[in-house]
């Protein structure tokens, strides 16, 4: 499957400690929330300007499900937050950005193996949802797609931008710090999966369980290959399949 299943070794300064990783991770998380909130605030201000009697709380609640806003917020936060992650790696003054974030090329057959794994997982997850009678498509995504206005922007945000930031942050920065701490690679897989699941609290219980399981698969791929590219490709493929499923569902609804 891969010729490198051990964590990266460093001859000089190692990644941030576990507490440094957690602390700086929280900083990135806060910046992410602030940037997303700033985009939302701009949309709310626009609504209030058009109608001064607008209930700000209700406007924010409704706009939080707006697909166009989601896409725009994602496209704004992705480059800025990735830039912050890169800055934090440089502040460590030792590990290279490529090594720290797992920017390591891998064999094509290894990539195809992991893409096959995620495709199989997507099929099994959908079969389980069907057998259990769970909703075919989350209401949150249906509502979001109804307000995308420009679908290509939404697709780019979910298939390219969101996976790029999330993998650089979770399976890149956080994973590398955790796997070189006392929790080791196994702890890194668990902790990054948990943190990534918390990021998606807008979904229901089944979806959150699926997201955690996905995080575990992504984390194992990162661990076994010591590369961010397999989880990044799997993440994009899974989102692509989910978007195709959403369009199919709306076409039948």
In which residue ranges do the predicted regions lie?
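Functionally important transmembrane alpha-helices
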Residues: 34-35, 186-197, 201, 205-253
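Membrane-interfacial alpha-helical segments at the cytosolic side of multi-pass membrane proteins
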Residues: 171-182, 244-249
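Juxtamembrane helix-loop-helix connectors linking adjacent transmembrane helices
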Residues: 43-72, 92-162, 180, 250-253
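Hydrophobic alpha-helical transmembrane segments
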Residues: 19-23, 71-72, 111-116, 152-156, ...
């Amino acid at each position: 499957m891969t010729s490198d299943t051990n964590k990266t070794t460093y001859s000089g300064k190692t990644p941030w400690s576990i507490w440094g990783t957690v602390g700086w991770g929280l900083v990135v998380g806060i910046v992410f929330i602030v940037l997303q909130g700033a985009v939302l605030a701009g949309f709310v201000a626009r609504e209030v300007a058009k109608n001064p009697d607008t209930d700000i709380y209700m406007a924010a609640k409704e706009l939080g499900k707006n697909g166009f806003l989601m896409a725009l917020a994602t496209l704004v936060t992705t480059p800025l937050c990735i830039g912050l992650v890169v800055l934090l790696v440089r502040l460590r003054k030792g590990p290279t950005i490529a090594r720290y974030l797992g920017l390591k090329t891998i064999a094509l057959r290894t990539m195809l193996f992991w893409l096959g794994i995620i495709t199989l997982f997507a099929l099994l997850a959908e079969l389980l949802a069907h057998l259990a009678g769970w909703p075919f498509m989350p209401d949150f995504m249906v509502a979001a797609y109804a307000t995308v206005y420009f679908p290509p922007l939404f697709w780019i945000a979910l298939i390219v931008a969101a996976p790029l930031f999330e993998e650089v942050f979770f399976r890149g920065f956080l994973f590398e710090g955790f796997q070189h701490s006392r929790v080791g690679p196994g702890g890194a897989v668990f902790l990054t999966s948990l943190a990534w699941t918390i990021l998606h609290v807008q979904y229901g219980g089944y979806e959150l369980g699926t997201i955690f399981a996905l995080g575990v698969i992504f984390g194992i791929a990162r661990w076994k290959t010591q590369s961010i590219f397999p989880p990044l490709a799997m993440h994009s493929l899974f989102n692509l399949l989910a978007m195709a499923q959403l369009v199919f569902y709306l076409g039948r609804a």
